[in-house]
Each structure stands twice: as structure tokens, then as C-alpha cells.
Amino acid sequence: MNDLSCPAIAFPFFLDPVIIRLGPIALHWYGLGYVVGILFAWWYAQKLLKKHSLWNTNHPPMDKEKIGDFVVWSAISVVVGGRLGQVLVWDLAYYFNHPSAIIAVWDGGMSFHGGFIGIIIAMIWFARKNNINIRAMFDIVAAGAPIGIGIVRICNFINQELWGNITTLPWAICFPLDPYYLPRHPSQLYEAFMEGFLLFIILFIIIFAFKALKRPGTVAGTFMIGYAIARSISEVYRAPQEDPEWFSTLFHSTGFTYGMALSLPMLFFGIYLLLQAFKHKSTENGHPKRKN
């Protein structure tokens, strides 16, 4: 705990990253956040698959029972991909010197972009194995993903990681783990709102008001573009992380961050999916409708 006093303009942080301790076992908010996010995405996907009118020709691309089979694979892919991304992309030197810390996922340290790549691989594998249109599979998973992202960002806040730049705004937060104990932007909460709850509302609207699931790839494309934009905005308020040396050399003092760079492929892939979704006027769960 920092002994310095929090300035009057800011709120002192007081949340415990651990929900409850039972002897040597501790339940962390961070781990619970991932569980709740995945369970919500599972529940929401089942609801979408049951509502046949949302899909082209009133026929969902898969049975709702199938999404239950995918839950385990999605959880594994997100955790493994997220952790590997954190280790290899952000903190390789630290984990090289502290290899035992690699498995300590409950302490935080998960790369969103690594988890994204992990679940993309899992979705492609699962879709091909079960003869499901890949773009429709992307849509189903993307529809509920923002809620999980929002919850995990709140857990980042509770874990006192990824805090923001110094600010004099009235909602500034003093984090005890900050060695300078200065008032900072609660950038994790900005991300929770933009990448999570706002993006979910946008996807909800295009699904139910504009029937976006009838054009496979529309929901996933919108999600990827929306996340890339939201992440880039939030990077402005995040405290700088230690970027790879080659990146710092190329983009020193430009304001272009490594997080922004990692979001660019998502932006381009999202645009590609939208172009593919609107390439054909009539589609049947991702395949051009055949003429008789």
C-alpha cells in the first residue's frame, strides 16, 4: 500500500482483487470475469439461434446445442491465446526471467489480441469440423463478445492494471500500486464502456433492427471495426506501456501506440468481412443463393 496521500481532486482506490479467500484458495474477480463473459456469450448465442426469424430463410446456421460444444474450446482458446500474446508480444523479457509467472493468469496479464487470434483459430476449426459457415460462426460469437470484454476491463480496473495517464479531472483515481500515487484516468472503465457495453448495444441494434445476421459477416465485421476504433481512442488515455524496442524506435513521439498497431489488422479484417457480406444481394447463411 502506498503511504502517499491521494490529492483531494481524486478518488482513492479501495477494491480488493480477491473476492473471497478460503485457506490457500482465492477467488479473484479477474477469473470470475472471464467465466461470466463466456457464459453470457453462450447464453446469448443460444437465444439468437432460437430466434429463426433473424436468419436468412428462417434457418440458423447451426443447432443451439452445437454452441454448447464450442464453449469449452472457446474458453481454452481465449485463455491460451491471451496469455501467449501477453508473454510473447508484451512482456517476453519478464517472463523469460520469471517462467513460473506464465501460468499465473489469475494475477492478470492477458492480451486481448492474443485471445482474439486464439478464438479465431478455434472458430475456423470448429466450423469446418461441423460444416458451419465460417462467417456465420464469427457472427454468433461476436454478438455477445463485447459484454465479456466490458466485464474483463472492469476486472482490469479492480486489479489495478492498465491505468490511465495523469489527469486533473474530477473522476480521477489514485491507484495504490502506482509508485507515484497520482490521480489518473480510469482508462479501464473507458474501455469497458466503449469496447464493451456501447459496442454490444450497437451490435444488438443491427441484429434486431436491421437483421444483420441475414448477411453473414456483418456482425463480426462491425464488431472488429468497432473494437479497433474504441481501442485506439482509449489508447490516448492509457498510461504508456513498454513497447517493443523496434516499435518505439519507429514511432517515438508520434502518439501511435503498439495497441493501436495491433488493432489495425482487426480494422482491415472487419472491413473485408463487411465487403464480403454485402457482395451478394441474396445469401443463405453465407452462401450465394442458387438460381433455379
UniProtKB/Swiss-Prot annotation:
Gene Ontology molecular function: any one: phosphatidylglycerol-prolipoprotein diacylglyceryl transferase activity
Single GO biological process annotation from the record: lipoprotein biosynthetic process
Enzyme class: transferase
Pathway(s) of this molecule: Protein modification; lipoprotein biosynthesis (diacylglyceryl transfer)
The organism's place on the tree of life at top rank: Bacteria
Predominant place of localization: membrane
Subcellular location as annotated: Cell inner membrane
Known role: Catalyzes the transfer of the diacylglyceryl group from phosphatidylglycerol to the sulfhydryl group of the N-terminal cysteine of a prolipoprotein, the first step in the formation of mature lipoproteins.
Record family assignment: Belongs to the Lgt family.
Protein name, entry field: Phosphatidylglycerol--prolipoprotein diacylglyceryl transferase
